[in-house]
Amino acid sequence: MMLPKFIITMSGVFRLGMVNQHKDLLKSGDQCIGGGYYHFDYTSNRIILDRSSYDFGKPKWHLLEVLKVPSVYRGFRLVYFYDDGREFDVSRELQIEYYD
């Protein structure tokens, strides 16, 4: 079943899409360091990230300094929610670079 999933790679690339499995978001040579699910909160201009990838586990944000986000998502804040309700403000904690 196609679901809204995201991954992050060791090179700092953030990729999301409607896929069956998180590994479907990988490109050749990517090393995934976690993923999860997402939804858009248009009221607060946020992309809400949560849960974890069955394939790759929870995102390992601590391994990154820069997150490369598709430019189409410019203007959205990225926020990850852990299972215990703790919030990690990705947009505040990491340097965000946009790519086309």
List each language-model region with its residue ranges:
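Eukaryotic phosphoinositide-binding membrane-targeting regions
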Residues: 1-100
